[in-house]
Amino acid sequence: MTAILERRESESLWGRFCNWITSTENRLYIGWFGVLMIPTLLTATSVFIIAFIAAPPVDIDGIREPVSGSLLYGNNIISGAIIPTSAAIGLHFYPIWEAASVDEWLYNGGPYELIVLHFLLGVACYMGREWELSFRLGMRPWIAVAYSAPVAAATAVFLIYPIGQGSFSDGMPLGISGTFNFMIVFQAEHNILMHPFHMLGVAGVFGGSLFSAMHGSLVTSSLIRETTENESANEGYRFGQEEETYNIVAAHGYFGRLIFQYAGFNNSRSLHFFLAAWPVVGIWFTALGISTMAFNLNGFNFNQSVVDSQGRVINTWADIINRANLGMEVMHERNAHNFPLDLAAVEAPSING
């Protein structure tokens, strides 16, 4: 008997690296998008933690009045934030080597731009990695499509809005109270509450929460009992089992009698598509709204739109919102200008008619 042995050529280092990167057998899938995602997210996270703890005050408005954002400079978890890059920098690319010194870079808010740009690259690569893993496992690509909604929202507030307004100083601060400040100022300057795309986003988020709670409670209430009364119903499920774990007919019948016959889904696949699509489409619209308001295509203005036969203004809730907007605009960046643009007009807007 003759044995013929074929000597396999040793695989190159690059080939082994490619196989390891794209292997679905790894505990955590890396993928080609992961090659870029890992360093960018690690950089953004590391700089965020360091800056949140120890960054010196930043001259956000470019008027030599620094604003403190870090814990070591008097803030707590609620009030602390990464202060946006100075208005003196505008939209310029501002890496460390563009500043005369690290102190100057910190004073002008360089960490904000570094964190935001690395973060946006990282989350975009995370979305690509979701698609890549789905592709390699033979799955459909809708996980990455759903994740595109928060990616679009983050891109809108951290990149598109600063581009439209002309400065990274108008981007959303990276902190709790900074986020609230951004929301208040955005309302004052763009009347976002009266923008239909924001309304669709609210419907998407609250509606998605409602539908998720309804679906979860219906499924939990119609589980097929596999255990005794003394055991948890959850013990009756085995991972990977072929049998249905709940009675969709019972859930559909309950919901149809609670509201009306055709209110519930009788197809589990279309139901779950709806649960995914509703909030995703809503957040897409919100991101689109932020991106249009970035270029000052603002919410509806119904100020003083109702008058009586004598021409006297009858105030509506739109006028109440307008008054609140003026108050918020007066208070923000109070040292950067003498008057907000709305109040510095030749003819002051009438409030009481």
Curated annotation (Swiss-Prot):
UniProt xrefs under Gene3D superfamilies = Photosystem II protein D1-like
Q: Please share the entry's free-text remark on the cofactor.
A: The D1/D2 heterodimer binds P680, chlorophylls that are the primary electron donor of PSII, and subsequent electron acceptors. It shares a non-heme iron and each subunit binds pheophytin, quinone, additional chlorophylls, carotenoids and lipids. D1 provides most of the ligands for the Mn4-Ca-O5 cluster of the oxygen-evolving complex (OEC). There is also a Cl(-1) ion associated with D1 and D2, which is required for oxygen evolution. The PSII complex binds additional chlorophylls, carotenoids and specific lipids.
Q: Does the keyword Thylakoid apply?
A: yes
GO CC, sorted alphabetically, is:
chloroplast thylakoid membrane; photosystem II
Question: Which residues participate in pheophytin a binding?
Answer: 126
- For the modification Phosphothreonine, the affected residues are 2
| Keyword flag Repressor | no
Which residues are tagged with the site Cleavage? Answer: 344-345
Propeptide span(s): 345-353
Name of the protein this chain belongs to: Photosystem II protein D1
